[in-house]
């Protein structure tokens, strides 16, 4: 049976436009979902409110204001899943967000359109990787941020496509310049779920076991948001609006109720590298991370 040319099938496909409305409560809920503490009133109290920059990742799954676990319409990664079927599972490999302007923390509307921008072939039996782009605009049509992410499909390789490029991020071979400990609570996945990522692997024990996990796991973009909050606190304290770009590989699953550590290496005046570590296992949850600011 011939293997379909996934690059020809998928590259350039765009989804229907989507939108979501939000207000200060959604901004504060997101902050709590990514670990904001009592001292972080800047993210949780409307008197001082600023948005944690990674609130701009919420449209990637985009299930806010719709029925749980239903995308209306499908985001690009899910469309790829529909075309590639039959497939057992797909896995997010990395995420990148570029900020064009700060997120309005009081209220606003996000509008966006998902697009498949590239497909990589890891070889027969090794899977394929689909890269998607989500440009998020506000109600006036101004660009707020651009999300890029890659999704791995286990059974889809061997169609003769180009290989996936290697990351150009190299963590310095020295001790970190800064470390900060934190804790992902036993209900962190449930709290983050309320921000829009209703994938069953993060809530349903039976579903998680079917996917070879002992229990539901923390959302990758929750770890991404945790890291962003901590990076802002160290590198640009009190000024989240200065964030320019953040990217990281999703390297290993994280269970609720786990101590974590952010490790940071400064590169220059406006760039740093980071890892987000599981302190129980010593493994990187997020690796090859980079954070840039204005």
Locations of the language-model features?
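A short linear-motif detector with a strong N-terminal bias
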Residues: 8-9, 68-78, 90-93, 109-115, ...
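Generic secondary-structure boundary/loop-capping signal
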Residues: 19, 40, 49, 55, ...
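Catalytic-pocket segment enriched in acidic/His residues
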Residues: 206-283
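Short, surface-exposed helix-loop/turn micro-motifs enriched in polar/charged residues
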Residues: 43, 126, 238-242
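A contiguous, surface-exposed recognition patch within enzymatic or periplasmic domains that forms
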Residues: 2-48, 167-223, 230-233
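HotDog/MaoC-like acyl-thioester-processing domains
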Residues: 2-15, 90-180, 250, 254-257, ...
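Hydrophobic, proline/glycine-rich low-complexity stretches
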Residues: 1-109
